[in-house]
């Protein structure tokens, strides 16, 4: 509850934020023009219709149309220089659900006072108990002074988090990055690093990496370079004396050999696009809508109390074939191809990616539409590059 009190007076706001020169804004003007054309066409169609009384049967359709109009307007906001931000202070009353989240005036902020944060008896939000001050975790042994005023709470917490004496922050980050490269962390419970989780297999290595990470200015890139150039990462997947390795390391927690890992779902899709020559390596920009299984794309889903529009991929291959990291994430609408290869769900924190070898993966690679499209792309690339049939066979 002390940590919760730090964020108790933090509110959301949509503030003006002009695009930076290095941001990817390609296609913005074309999308704005497309939205204007659709809006104008819809308005002309509505203006041409005769006035009619709304019958009870039409009421539901009108309600659905209004909600789809709200969704359309929200999608157009993606091309406006607006940033989803936060501020400290009183909340601002919204006149409509679709209205923009604006910060209150400075005068309104100066007249308000922070609300009291209390321990909720039994976890019930309507049973406020003993009041609690903003504070940090005492178990770390590192104290911090968090102000009770509106301003300064999150800044003080951030300074406590990145303090060199904080025993958690650097170790948690290092353990996560190590797990990304080796398939398992030095401590196998990344979400529960500490006394209640599994102890690290190599605690001295974890401590040294954490100190080195802080010493290098918290540089993630430098940490990646340090791990990838280490002898542990560059080891072979086989050992000249496997019996000795099995005897000395029966649980497989050591690093005498590098245990290969399967490509993650996103890496697999990107690799298939790269081999076929269809991958668009452009960085940044808006989320894209890749191709998806037709049956999954047409699957009904609910949003805002009514049915959502069907999933429609982006019209251009250059948009659809971006890297998977730029794909739009919809919690209720997941790509079956990526899910088959253990892509974690977006509705919960993923402690560790599970790896499975199941029959649907074989069918997805042999018979799936994704594989078929990539095979056609590879064939087109080979035929375009090769001068003869023998060259085409060699390239393939």
Question: What are these regions, as identified by a protein language model?
Answer:
Residues 330, 334, 342-343:
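Short Ser/Thr-interspersed hydrophobic loop/turn segments at strand-loop and sheet-helix junctions
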Residues 23-321, 338, 344, 348-359, ...:
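Primarily short, surface-exposed interaction patches in extracytoplasmic proteins
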């Amino acid at each position: 509850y002390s940590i919760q009190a730090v964020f108790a007076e933090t509110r959301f706001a949509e503030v003006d934020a002009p695009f930076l020169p290095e941001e990817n804004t390609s296609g913005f003007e074309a999308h704005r023009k497309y939205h204007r054309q659709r809006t104008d066409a819809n308005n002309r169609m509505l203006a041409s219709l005769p006035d009619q009384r709304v019958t009870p049967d039409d009421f539901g359709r009108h309600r659905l149309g209004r909600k789809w109009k709200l969704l359309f307007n929200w999608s157009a906001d993606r091309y406006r220089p607006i940033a989803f931000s936060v501020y400290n202070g009183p909340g601002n009353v919204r006149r409509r659900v679709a209205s923009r989240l604006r910060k209150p005036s400075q005068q309104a902020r100066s007249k308000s006072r922070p609300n009291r944060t209390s321990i909720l008896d039994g976890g019930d939000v309507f049973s406020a108990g003993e009041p609690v001050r903003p504070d940090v975790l005492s178990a770390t042994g590192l104290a911090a002074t968090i102000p009770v005023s509106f301003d300064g709470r999150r800044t003080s917490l951030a300074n406590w988090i990145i303090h060199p004496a904080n025993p958690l922050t650097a170790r948690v980050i290092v353990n996560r990055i190590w797990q990304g490269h080796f398939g398992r962390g030095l401590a196998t419970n990344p979400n529960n690093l500490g006394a209640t989780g599994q102890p690290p297999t190599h605690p001295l290595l974890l401590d040294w990496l954490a100190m080195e990470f802080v010493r290098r200015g918290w540089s993630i890139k430098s940490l990646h370079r340090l791990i990838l150039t280490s002898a542990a990462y560059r080891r072979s997947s086989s050992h000249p004396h496997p019996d000795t390795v099995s005897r000395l390391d029966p649980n497989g927690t050591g690093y005498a050999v590098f245990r290969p890992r399967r490509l993650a779902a996103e890496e697999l899709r990107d690799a298939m696009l790269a081999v076929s020559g269809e991958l668009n390596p452009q960085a940044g920009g808006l989320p894209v809508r890749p191709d998806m299984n037709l049956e999954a794309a047409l699957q009904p889903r609910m949003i805002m109390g009514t049915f959502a529009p069907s999933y429609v991929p982006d019209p251009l291959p250059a948009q659809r074939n971006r890297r998977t990291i730029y794909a739009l994430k919809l919690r209720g609408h997941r790509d079956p191809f990526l899910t088959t290869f253990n892509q974690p769900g977006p509705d919960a924190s993923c402690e560790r990616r599970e790896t499975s070898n199941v029959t649907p993966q074989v069918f997805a690679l042999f018979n799936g539409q994704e594989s078929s499209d990539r095979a056609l792309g590879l064939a087109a690339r080979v035929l375009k590059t090769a001068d003869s049939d023998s060259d085409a066979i060699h390239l393939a």
